[in-house]
């Protein structure tokens, strides 16, 4: 199964708008019992989340997993820091890459693969405002071309 495949539960659409994604890595995530139940229900927000390397381990910050509705007083903290599981070689490579100016680790999607929750993180370089404008112009032009092609196929 290729990276990023499986049942997608949440996507960080803002990441592709704000960053040039250069590489992606599939990571496992350490969760508590009520967290996985809430994730399976699709109650996850990855909008402002980011990954950070601390003490040689990768952690995911600001990913909001809503408390499980049927949970009791032992429910989890929605914004707690969660550990990501990666191979040591990959972590060492990321340490070197993220020390460069402008690079950061951004979670792209959360999905289930063989019953396990996985997070696809990307090594991204921040976009400037004019880069974002160029992307929007490119998307609009592509949309116009497709619309014209579709109209031509219909027989106009």
From Swiss-Prot:
Pfam families, per database record: SmpB
One Gene Ontology term from the biological process aspect of the record: trans-translation
Function statement: Required for rescue of stalled ribosomes mediated by trans-translation. Binds to transfer-messenger RNA (tmRNA), required for stable association of tmRNA with ribosomes. tmRNA and SmpB together mimic tRNA shape, replacing the anticodon stem-loop with SmpB. tmRNA is encoded by the ssrA gene; the 2 termini fold to resemble tRNA(Ala) and it encodes a 'tag peptide', a short internal open reading frame. During trans-translation Ala-aminoacylated tmRNA acts like a tRNA, entering the A-site of stalled ribosomes, displacing the stalled mRNA.
Cellular localization per UniProt: Cytoplasm
CDD domains referenced in this protein's UniProt entry, alphabetically: SmpB (cd09294)
This protein's encoding gene: smpB
GO MF, any single term: RNA binding
Keywords from the named record: Cytoplasm, RNA-binding
Protein name: SsrA-binding protein
Keyword Protease appears in the UniProt entry: no
Main localization, broad class: cytoplasm
Protein family membership: Belongs to the SmpB family.
NCBIfam families in the cross-refs: PRK05422.1, smpB
GO cellular component, one term: cytosol
Disulfide bonds: none
């Amino acid at each position: 199964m290729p990276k990023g495949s499986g049942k997608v539960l949440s996507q960080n659409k803002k990441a592709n708008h704000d960053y040039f994604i250069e590489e992606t890595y599939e990571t496992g995530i350490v969760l508590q019992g009520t967290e996985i139940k809430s994730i399976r229900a699709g109650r996850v927000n990855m909008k402002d989340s980011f990954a950070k390397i601390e003490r040689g381990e990768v952690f995911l910050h600001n990913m909001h997993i809503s408390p499980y509705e049927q949970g009791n007083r032992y429910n989890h903290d929605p914004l707690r820091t969660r550990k990501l599981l990666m191979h040591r070689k990959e972590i060492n490579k990321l340490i070197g890459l993220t020390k460069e100016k402008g690079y950061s680790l951004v979670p792209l999607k959360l999905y289930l693969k063989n019953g396990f929750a996985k997070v696809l993180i990307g090594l991204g370089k921040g976009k400037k405002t004019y880069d974002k404008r160029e992307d929007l112009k490119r998307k609009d032009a592509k949309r116009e071309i497709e619309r014209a092609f579709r109209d031509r196929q219909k027989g106009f």
